């Protein structure tokens, strides 16, 4: 019987083999210079697929004596061929195979390999991996598959990862914030450290969702996981010091010096950083975060910090638990200055108009020492303690010099610079006839402020059932300020006067809370979470204010007459109790429903004394805020989030009092006793889809918002005195619809297309500028449509990178009651960024055309060609670099912004140092890895 089965099996095997199909890839490899066939070329085919189990198949082939090769591919999926030979540059070709579903013969044609500069030098040839692979629910990025140079830092690699972006030191994945870790541990400075570590130190980069502490202990997903970008650092790069130093010199005597040292360690990481510059950059570093922001339009910064952290493991604790404590003192000294130019068009009923022009030159000085500490650790396998401490002191000085002028018609019809010319406009001239008021003021303010914040939490895990926790939080702020000013007011209507003002202000703001929380799983599919928090808040505010219009009563530029209308004493006490009931229902491994219902009960009391207003206001309120979220997740490849929430917002109790603040006599703020609470509805649908085979990442978001009783600012204007009054008021409901699509795809090896489109439709209301608040106000419905499209197509190959891009924004405003103010605003920035690398040189060019249309300040409309270039020379194995930069070659850059409301339209402009030449030097200090 066995003798019969054996030949029968062989026959069946042959028949089955003949029935199989496969794609056949073939071609010829030649020398690009001599055009001669190359034999013995290594051809590595790496194929990846997507299914229930992710897989990668690698096969090696060799060209024959005539340069020919043949590769049979049995599986369906993306396939990457790498052609390499000693003395030649490697070439990579990406294709797709349909495997056994096809029997195509794919002719890849002629593949030409370019010889290296030293043809006979022996080189190491390594196989290329795909950029992205999947390992369960983890996205794995392979650094060796990206186009990188020796000495490149990790930030260069991160910018190439599909779906990952960096904003001010914070990393995002598909618009959601992610936390940076190294070997599963937090690192000081967050994403900022990416510019310091070499790519060669990274083995792999993993993107995954880190479970919450509750999920780790219960084994049930509670939907509160955090996106994590985990850089797997090679062991021989740990417990080493990495350093960075840079110096930059600009024209106009600007400079910047940076020093940074980091010790990567799984147990005791340390980071020290210092920054000295007058290029208008403020810096701050902390545990797992870093940020940089402009101080002002011009500025100086001196900043230094040292951060230390200790990590340890607890025997018996769940895998992946974190135990650490860190602290970091810092000192910052900042000076900022600049000038704002502002034009505001207030909308009146009919064809009437009111224009306000302002020029404000300001200077700021701050000294800010601070101390931060954070810790989280397990005392045993079931109890966790965490805290966060921040202590900060700020001492500052401010000076403002402001010039304002108000007109009853568009002043740009009568002068090119109406604000400056209004001071000397001759009597009877058109500009003088439409001038209603001019104000020149000088204000000096000195401040001192102390801030303390402390959070402490204890959690006890109830095995697989859940967690019980207690927490307390305290915030304390003590501030003191002194203000002195001089104001000169003139008007064609005969209202001319000088005013001196002085005030010293002190305040204490203290807030403490105690909370308890219970999260309990009834089974693996249903969890209930209950939180109760009791909060007490105390506010004391005192202001002694003096004002004189007669120089006789002014002593040393300080008035001596008390101004009771602006002297105040305020005491506010608040008791608030918040109860939150949350549930989580898991229908299966992919689908879950989360719901929350909050009940906030609070009692407020305010004792307020200001001028003739001496009152005690009390408010007792109960607020219910529900929220529902439906989540569907198919691993890392696809997800749906559908959410709805309802929120009630109470106006500040002070804003509901009939007070009047005339500290600025030309811009008076008032309260409104009839102010109602706001109610917000928000519906949102978010869908994410990842196609690793196509290197495609998609994100779609749809949302609808509805606001009941929205609060806006209403304005009243007296043309004879030039005084504006404003107070908060409710309007009819607002509506807004939003749609957003983010498309990010790698096209083969060298191309990448990224397009982010956003459209928003909104309808809101405001009140036209009135002349008397005692008269009925006129509503002005506003319909707005906004479309934004940010698209870039990047090409990277060998030493060339080209990126054409366009950033387009269109705003359409339609006012029902003041159609004269309808506008269509366009901002389009179209350009080309080019990076060319040759040996140790890198040339960067960014030339673009910034087009604006529809703005009131006519000089900002039209085309503005902008061009920046930069040349960098790398040396010392790419660890050091000299950079020469020329910014705004055509001297056409401007800083311009626009804000349109239902009651006004404001345009602002300010100057910065946008045109300069700079030279900088930077050096990376990398340790030598120990090969174990």
Give residue spans per PLM region:
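Short Pro-Gly-centered beta-turn/loop motif in secreted/extracellular proteins
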Residues: 70-78
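Primarily recognizes Gram-negative and organellar outer-membrane beta-barrels
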Residues: 53-54, 190-191, 211-253, 268-932
């Amino acid at each position: 019987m066995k003798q019969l089965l054996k030949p029968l099996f062989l026959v069946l095997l042959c028949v089955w083999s003949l029935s199989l199909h496969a794609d056949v890839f073939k071609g010829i490899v030649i020398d690009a210079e001599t055009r001669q066939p190359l034999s013995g070329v290594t051809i590595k085919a790496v194929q990846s697929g997507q299914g229930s189990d992710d897989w990668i198949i690698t096969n090696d082939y060799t060209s024959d004596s005539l340069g020919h090769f043949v590769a049979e591919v049995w599986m369906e999926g993306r396939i990457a061929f790498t052609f390499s030979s000693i003395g030649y540059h490697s070439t990579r070709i990406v294709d797709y195979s349909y495997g056994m579903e096809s029997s195509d013969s794919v002719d890849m044609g002629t593949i030409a390999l370019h010889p290296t500069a030293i043809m006979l030098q022996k080189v190491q040839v390594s196989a290329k991996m795909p950029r992205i692979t999947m390992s369960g629910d983890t996205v794995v990025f392979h650094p060796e598959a990206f186009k990188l140079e020796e000495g490149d830092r990790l930030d260069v690699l991160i910018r190439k990862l599909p779906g990952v972006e960096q904003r001010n030191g914070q990393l995002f994945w598909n618009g959601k914030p992610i936390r940076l870790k190294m070997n599963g541990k937090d690192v000081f400075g967050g994403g900022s450290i990416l510019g310091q570590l070499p790519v060669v130190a990274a083995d792999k980069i993993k993107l995954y969702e880190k479970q919450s502490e509750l999920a780790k202990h219960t084994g049930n997903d509670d939907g509160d996981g955090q996106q994590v970008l985990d850089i797997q650092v090679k062991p021989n790069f740990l417990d080493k010091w990495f350093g960075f130093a840079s110096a930059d010199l600009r024209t106009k005597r600007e400079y910047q010096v940076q020093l940074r040292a980091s010790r990567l360690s799984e147990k005791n990481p340390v980071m020290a950083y210092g920054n000295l510059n007058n290029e208008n950059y403020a810096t701050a570093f902390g545990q797992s975060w870093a940020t940089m922001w402009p101080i002002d339009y011009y500025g100086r910064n001196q900043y230094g910090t040292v951060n230390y952290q200790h990590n340890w493991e607890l025997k018996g604790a769940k895998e992946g638990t974190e135990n650490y404590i860190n602290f970091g003192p810092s000192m910052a000294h900042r000076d900022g200055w600049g000038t704002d130019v502002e034009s505001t068009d207030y909308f009146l009923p009919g064809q009437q108009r009111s224009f306000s022009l302002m020029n404000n030159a300001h200077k700021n000085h701050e000294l800010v020492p601070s101390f931060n500490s954070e810790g989280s650790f397990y005392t045993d396998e079931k109890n966790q303690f965490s805290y966060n401490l921040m202590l900060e002191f700020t001492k500052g000085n401010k000076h403002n010099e402001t010039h304002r002028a108000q007109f009853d018609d568009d002043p740009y019809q009568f002068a090119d610079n109406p604000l400056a010319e209004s001071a000397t406009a001759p009597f009877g001239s058109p500009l003088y006839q439409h001038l209603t008021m001019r104000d020149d003021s000088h204000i000096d303010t000195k401040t001192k402020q102390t801030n303390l914040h402390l959070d402490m939490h204890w959690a006890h895990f109830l095995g697989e059932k859940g967690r019980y926790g207690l927490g307390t939080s305290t915030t304390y702020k003590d501030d003191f300020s002194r203000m002195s000013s001089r104001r000169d007011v003139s008007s064609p209507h005969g209202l001319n006067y000088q005013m001196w003002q002085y005030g010293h202000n002190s305040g204490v703001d203290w807030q403490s809370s105690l909370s308890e929380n219970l999260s309990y799983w009834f089974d693996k599919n249903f969890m209930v979470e209950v939180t109760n928090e009791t909060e007490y808040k105390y506010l004391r505010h005192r202001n002694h204010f003096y004002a004189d219009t007669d120089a006789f009563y002014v002593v040393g530029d300080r008035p001596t007459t008390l101004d009771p209308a602006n002297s105040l004493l305020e005491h506010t006490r608040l008791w608030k109790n918040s109860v939150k009931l949350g549930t989580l229902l898991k229908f299966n491994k992919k689908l879950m429903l989360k719901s929350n219902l909050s009940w906030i009960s609070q009692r407020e009391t305010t004792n307020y004394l200001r001028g003739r207003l001496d009152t005690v206001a009390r408010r007792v309120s109960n607020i219910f805020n529900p929220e529902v979220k439906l989540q569907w997740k198919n691993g890392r490849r696809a997800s749906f989030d559908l959410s709805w929430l309802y929120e009630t917002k109470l106006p500040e109790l002070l804003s509901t009092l009939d007070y009047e603040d005339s500290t600025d006599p030309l811009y008076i703020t008032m309260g409104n006793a009839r102010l109602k609470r706001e109610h917000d509805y928000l519906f949102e649908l978010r869908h994410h889809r990842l196609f690793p085979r196509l290197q495609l990442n998609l994100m779609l978001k749809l949302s609808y918002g509805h606001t009941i009783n929205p609060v806006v600012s209403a304005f009243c204007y007296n043309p004879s005195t030039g005084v504006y009054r404003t107070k908060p008021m409710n309007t009819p409901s607002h509506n807004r619809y939003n749609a957003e699509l983010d498309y990010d795809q790698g096209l083969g090896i060298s191309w990448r297309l990224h397009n982010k489109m956003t459209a928003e439709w909104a309808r809101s209301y405001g009140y036209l500028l009135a002349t008397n608040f005692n008269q009925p106000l006129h509503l002005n419905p506003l319909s707005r449509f906004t479309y934004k499209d940010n698209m870039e197509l990047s090409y990277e190959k060998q030493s060339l990178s080209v990126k054409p891009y366009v950033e387009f924004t269109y705003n359409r405003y339609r006012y029902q009651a003041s159609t004269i103010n309808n506008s269509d605003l366009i901002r389009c920035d179209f350009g080309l960024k080019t990076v060319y690398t040759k040996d140790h040189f890198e040339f960067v060019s960014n030339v673009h055309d910034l087009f604006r249309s529809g703005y009131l300040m006519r000089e900002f409309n039209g085309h503005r060609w902008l061009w920046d270039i930069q040349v960098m020379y790398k040396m010392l194995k790419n660890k050091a670099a000299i950079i020469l930069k020329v910014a705004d070659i055509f001297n056409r850059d401007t800083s311009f912004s626009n804000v349109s409301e239902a009651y006004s339209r404001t345009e602002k402009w300010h100057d910065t140092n946008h045109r300069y030449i700079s030279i900088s030097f930077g050096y990376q200090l990398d340790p030598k890895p120990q090969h174990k």
